[in-house]
Design a protein with these regions (language model features):
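Sec-dependent signal peptide recognition
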Residues: 3-9
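Non-transmembrane, aqueous-exposed alpha-helical and coiled segments at domain scale
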Residues: 21-38, 136, 210, 216, ...
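Residue-level signature of catalytic and energy-coupling elements of molecular machines
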Residues: 51, 127, 223
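Mid-length scaffold segments of soluble, non-membrane domains
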Residues: 95-165
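An amphipathic alpha-helical core segment
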Residues: 153, 157-205
Length: 240
């Protein structure tokens, strides 16, 4: 009797395991690769939009700016990581450093339209060699895939565009003044200025993907964020 019960339980475990192994195949039977890709891209597009709205000023035409996005959140705020900052603060330039950090973040926030345009174009044409693996790759699989595939292009876009905002908000001139103060204090007149574009872009990109991962996870795990129940995003992600 005990042997029969044991064999019965063993068969149940085997069947259950087999069903779990077939889950990916089940989704593939329900949806084509093109449909899964479309659903992944809808999720990516929604996550990017939510990220841009959280971190950047996307459209201020006729609207009052209600927040300072990157700057408002300690989790995403862009800081000066250059070695001269500690020296400046120690010599009484805390207010000037704080002012520079503020306008530096504002410059990053003003890149919202450019960031939105970059990702809208990128996601529109995005393909995945094995879309089903991305679908079942975990709560941040889309973000990680885009990070791997498109981060270098994203960085290049920001490196090209951020200087425009730096000039508009006097980031460059303010930074130059603080560098000069540093040179006066230390006597270290470096022939080349300390760069500020690269560390700013690096922090922007890190913050962007960090926030996008959170938004993707929310979409994957919350049916209310998946749109119309008859839509492709909802139908595909409801199989997870």
């Amino acid at each position: 009797m005990e042997k029969r019960i044991y064999l019965l339980l063993l068969s149940v475990v085997f069947i259950f395991s087999a069903c779990r192994d077939k889950s990916d195949e089940f989704v593939e039977q329900l949806f084509t690769d093109s449909q899964i890709t479309a659903a992944l891209n809808q999720c990516a597009d929604s996550a990017v939009m939510k990220t841009c709205n959280a971190l950047c000023i996307v459209d201020t035409a006729g609207e009052e700016i209600l927040g300072y996005y990157f700057f408002d959140s300690k989790s995403y705020r862009i800081d000066l990581v250059n070695q001269i900052v500690d020296t400046l603060v120690a010599n009484g330039y805390q207010d000037q450093v704080d002012s520079l950090i503020f306008i530096l973040n504002r410059a990053a926030e003003q890149c919202g339209e450019k960031i939105s345009q970059f990702w809208a174009s990128t996601i529109k044409n995005m393909t995945y060699p094995k879309p089903n693996l991305v679908l079942h790759g975990g709560n941040n699989a889309i973000t990680e895939y885009l990070k791997t595939a498109k981060q270098s292009e994203f960085v290049a876009t920001l490196v090209a565009y951020l200087p425009v905002q730096f000039t508009a908000l006097n980031v460059d001139s303010t930074w130059s003044q603080l560098q000069y103060k540093y040179f006066e204090i230390t006597g270290n007149y470096s022939p080349a200025p300390f760069g500020i574009i690269t560390p700013t872009v690096e922090q922007m990109v890190t913050g962007f993907f960090k926030k996008m991962a959170i938004e993707e996870a929310a979409i994957r795990t919350t049916s209310a964020l998946q749109g119309n129940p008859n839509g492709l995003l909802y139908r595909v992600f409801s199989t997870l």
